[in-house]
Amino acid sequence: MGKQNSKLRPEILQDLRENTEFTDHELQEWYKGFLKDCPTGHLTVEEFKKIYANFFPYGDASKFAEHVFRTFDTNGDGTIDFREFIIALSVTSRGKLEQKLKWAFSMYDLDGNGYISRGEMLEIVQAIYKMVSSVMKMPEDESTPEKRTDKIFKQMDTNNDGKLSLEEFIKGAKSDPSIVRLLQCDPSSTSQF
């Protein structure tokens, strides 16, 4: 009796179909898996960090996972429900480049003011380095988080105001594929750094 139904209700399925790039069958399969891993229907930051650590066994992914979690948790209640999870997964795995860049921008914009400051960029880049630097050799001009942040700002901050707008971020990323790799937050693509 206390067991949650492992099928999505028709109205929820329709909402997710309209807001993701997944088929009905895929949505039902993801939902079953989500409930198996999160029987409460909600994922906490600690649970999320444990899952994320599996993708990066040789580094410390906890800080980066916190930033990803915050970006997934669109209603700010401190948990990720299935809707938040599947919409973010759709954007990051099947979204168009512009959607992915907007999502990444929202992750880097820590205070939500619509701009990425040098400090915000540095915090995320430091988290990435903690996660992957033990298994990756960085080029000399990106050998520290500070150098990588400087490189990103040099290329993207076109008006030199010390912060990146969404427009600068998207334009800069689109004009330089290596920047897309620098900003990449998809665990399966870290080898492309």
Curated annotation (Swiss-Prot):
GO terms for biological process: regulation of signal transduction. A lipid is attached at G2 (N-myristoyl glycine). Keywords: Calcium, Lipoprotein, Metal-binding, Myristate, Repeat. Ca(2+) 1 binds at D73, N75, D77, T79, E84. Ca(2+) 3 binds at D157, N159, D161, K163, E168. Residues 41-58, 60-95, 96-131, 144-179 form the EF-hand domain. One of its GO terms (molecular function) is calcium ion binding. The keyword Repeat applies. Ca(2+) 2 binds at D109, D111, N113, Y115, E120. Pfam families: EF-hand_7 (PF13499). It comes from the Eukaryota. PANTHER family: CALCIUM BINDING PROTEINS (PTHR23055), HIPPOCALCIN-LIKE PROTEIN 1 (PTHR23055:SF79). Probably binds two or three calcium ions. Belongs to the recoverin family. This is Hippocalcin-like protein 1. The gene is hpcal1.
